[in-house]
Amino acid sequence: MEKKDIRVLALDLDGTLTNDQKVVTPATRAALDAAAAKGVTIVLASGRPTAGIMPLAKELGLDKKGGCILSYNGGAIIDCATGETLYRKQLDAKYVPQLCAFAREQGVAIVT
């Protein structure tokens, strides 16, 4: 694939987009700006809730130049410029008690 064919750049946050201090370095910012200038859609991907990612999206200017947030480990995709939910998939609440009981039986925690 040639670079001109790249349309989307999806980046995990912690340790990928940000460094050990949870900071986006100037070099990374410049690379993101260059990609966006070429029409590449920047997607911030995380297991965090949307509200936990939006401040970084705004800091990077994705609310103005476009981009998306992929939150809840892929459970939601939000357009940063409009706030529109492009995709949402939720677990039906009726399954939660059964899943919690199973997790307790297995001695594991449920991480969302």
State the predicted function of each range:
Residues 5-22, 44, 99:
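Asp-based phosphoryl-transfer active-site loop
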Residues 2, 19-22, 40, 86:
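A general structural-boundary detector
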Residues 3-6, 29:
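Short, small/polar residue-rich loop motifs at catalytic or cofactor-binding pockets
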Residues 23, 27:
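Residue-level recognition of oxygen-bearing side chains
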Residues 28-112:
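Active-site phosphate-binding/coordination module
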